[in-house]
């Protein structure tokens, strides 16, 4: 007979107070700025990075996957052979992290902060009677600074900060949940690559908006020189004739020379493909998932593509979130949180495949079957 029940619940008691209401922190001016959304900003570095199409696509893929999955709670118990996960009833905030927002929204922007800045911040707005958090709100990472860890230019964070300033005001670190990514934020670690992509896109924009002639009329050497007005009139009359006739006529003194510029050269297609590949390396997402041409590549079905996206793009950030939320400052010791990834990896696909595999009607000696 088991000594412990596997139906143990971890339902949180009703919240009784806000996190900052009874704070004994000496300076907590930053808490007064929480929720003042008109002051919120994502910063210049974030805007520059998201202006690169490949980075924007990678962020959309990773954020859409993680933010669409449900969180579930469990504890671990020794069953005589190995540690076994025992499901627990979730605390109320797992279904509504921020009472004023959806889980999809707060998790999407948390993923963005972890990708771009290497860290993210949640402020605890309410606590339950046992002292554990009951509700959170996200603080934009671009507005949070840490005096004990500069972070830039490498974007490396060594541990949760004890001196956090939000929007210029110091905030009690005990009222914060600090998520630290295992990789540097790309706005710090890939500044040159991002700047190169932006300059390349600017060059393509200039070329796209500039009118390059399809050909040049060249007056031969030894001929009577023409003034600028005469040259302009000659080109205009030539264009008018070509617009209404299939055949053009030129005197021996004037030659028509086609320009060697092609649309792919004008739009720097090869350079753009290479830079997109570089950005896929920066984001850690396989290039084929970002619709980048990778030459000859083995066929990959939908299930394998999902597994690649989860393994190479999402797993580390998802683990950062769940391990942080499983810490003792968020949940009681021994209580853990994880994402339910079954539906994403193969759950719904298996259901679809079962529906598609319908029994075929019988065939007899080539005679068509009729119902």
Language-model segment annotations:
Residues 115, 210, 230-231, 272, ...:
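Active-site-proximal structural scaffolding
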Residues 2-268, 272-274, 278, 353, ...:
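Structured, contiguous alpha/beta core segments that scaffold functional sites
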Residues 275-276, 281-283, 321-322:
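Internal mixed-charge
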Residues 2-5, 11-13, 62, 297-316, ...:
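Activation/maturation switch segments at domain boundaries
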Residues 284-287, 368-370:
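Helix N-cap / loop-to-helix initiation motif
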Residues 247-250, 287-298, 324-333:
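Short acidic alpha-helical/loop segments enriched in Asp/Glu that coordinate divalent cations
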């Amino acid at each position: 007979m088991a000594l412990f029940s596997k139906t143990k619940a971890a339902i949180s008691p009703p919240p009784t107070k806000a996190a900052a209401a009874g704070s004994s922190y000496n300076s907590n001016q930053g808490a007064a700025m929480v929720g003042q959304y008109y002051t919120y900003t994502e910063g210049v570095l974030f805007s520059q990075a998201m202006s690169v199409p490949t980075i924007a696509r990678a962020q959309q893929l990773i954020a859409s996957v993680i933010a669409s999955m449900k969180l579930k709670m469990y504890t671990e118990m020794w069953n005589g052979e190995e540690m076994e996960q025992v499901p627990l009833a979730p605390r109320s905030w797992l279904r509504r992290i921020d009472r004023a927002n959806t889980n999809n929204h707060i998790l999407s922007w948390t993923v963005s902060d972890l990708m771009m800045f290497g860290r993210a911040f949640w402020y605890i707005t309410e606590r339950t009677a046992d002292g554990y958090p009951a509700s959170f709100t996200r603080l934009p990472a671009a507005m949070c600074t840490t005096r004990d860890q500069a972070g830039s230019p490498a974007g490396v964070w060594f541990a949760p900060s004890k001196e956090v300033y939000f929007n210029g005001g110091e905030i009690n670190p005990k009222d914060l949940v600090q998520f630290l990514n295992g990789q540097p934020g790309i706005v710090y670690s890939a500044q040159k690559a991002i700047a190169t992509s932006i300059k390349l896109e600017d060059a393509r924009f200039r070329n796209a908006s500039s009118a390059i002639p399809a050909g040049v009329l060249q007056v031969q050497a030894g001929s009577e020189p023409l003034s600028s007005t005469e040259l302009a009139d000659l080109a205009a009359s030539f264009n008018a004739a070509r617009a209404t006739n299939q055949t053009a006529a030129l005197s021996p003194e004037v030659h028509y020379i086609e320009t060697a510029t092609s649309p792919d050269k004008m739009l720097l297609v090869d350079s753009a493909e290479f830079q997109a590949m570089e950005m896929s390396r920066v984001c850690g997402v396989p290039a084929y998932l970002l619709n980048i041409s990778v030459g000859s590549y083995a066929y990959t079905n939908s299930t394998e593509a999902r597994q690649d996206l989860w393994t190479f793009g999402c797993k580390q950030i998802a683990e950062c979130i769940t391990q942080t939320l499983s810490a003792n400052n968020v949940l009681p010791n021994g209580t853990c949180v994880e994402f339910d990834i079954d539906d994403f990896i193969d759950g719904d696909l298996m259901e679809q495949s079962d529906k598609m595999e319908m029994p075929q009607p019988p065939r007899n000696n080539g005679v068509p079957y009729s119902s």
